[in-house]
Amino acid sequence: MASHSAAGRRPTALVHIALFVAIAAVIINSSVCLGAAVHDAATSGTGALDPNVPAVPTPGGAGQPYTGRGCRTVYGCKPPAGSQP
């Protein structure tokens, strides 16, 4: 009887190992991609490592105040005359 219960646990352990390997592969892949993006930004002079580029872009553009979420017809608001919805 003891060997039967041990055999029942073996597939569960294999599933856990397979899930761990799959998740680790995804994490490693995304880390490599992020590292490449930071490296490309550093070599091109744009991005988070450039002191002349703001860390957080402003939605209104450079020098424009933040006016909140953009106006969309879905929100039930009307944009000011001459602006895009």
Swiss-Prot record:
Extracellular side: 35-85
Membrane topology label: Single-pass type II membrane protein
GO cellular component: membrane
Main localisation: membrane
Transmembrane feature ranges: 13-34
Sequence ranges on the Cytoplasmic membrane side: 1-12
Key words, A-Z: Membrane, Transmembrane, Transmembrane helix
Subcellular location: Membrane
Functional note: Associated with pathogen defense.
Record protein name field: Protein WIR1B
Annotated organism of origin: Triticum aestivum
Lineage of origin: Eukaryota, Viridiplantae, Streptophyta, Embryophyta, Tracheophyta
